[in-house]
Amino acid sequence: MNSSTKPFEISKQLVLQAYYKVKANKGSPGIDGESIEMFEANLKNNLYRIWNRMSSGCYFPPSVKAVCIPKKSGGMRVLGIPTVSDRVAQMVVKMVLEPILEPVFDEDSYGYRPGRSSHDAIAVTRKRCWNYDWVVEFDVKV
């Protein structure tokens, strides 16, 4: 592997591990209509195709399936459902980048972080509100 052109090596084993994580999460078929069970019927070829495209730098994600779900407050929210294949590719990226980036994130960052939730952010905010009796408010204009 030439490290100057490929900063991350993607092994076939990593793609397989990513698939098992995606399978455990279940999920609906994407725009291609392929379920996890259908994907698994041709697992070896499907995983090889993902690995080959990602390793060669020519992976391009397919479109997502738009699904509208109702909001509790009224109205609708549009969700984008990726294909099983794209979920595996996304998981590969997550598994490579998360251990590298997690240590450099700010300790006050809670969104989409492992072991952190919005409830954790609320608890820290509540604690800080009780510890301080002042607020700094400002607006930045260009």
Where are these regions (language model features)?
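Conserved, non-catalytic sequence blocks in retroelement Pol enzymes and Pol-derived host proteins
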Residues: 38, 81-84, 111-116
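Conserved pre-motif C helix in the palm subdomain of viral-like polymerases
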Residues: 76-105, 141
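Phosphate/adenylate-binding "loop-and-lid" substructures adjacent to NTP/NAD/dNTP-binding pockets
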Residues: 33-70
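Conserved catalytic palm subdomain of right-hand nucleotidyl-transferase polymerases, strongest
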Residues: 28-35, 80, 119-142
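Non-catalytic, polymerase-adjacent accessory regions of viral genome-replication enzymes
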Residues: 1-44, 48
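Short, compositionally biased low-complexity segments
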Residues: 11-27, 64-66, 95-100, 130
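Hydrophobic face of alpha-helices
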Residues: 40, 47, 89-90, 94, ...
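Catalytic phosphate-handling regions of large nucleic-acid enzymes and associated NTPases
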Residues: 61, 70, 104, 111-130
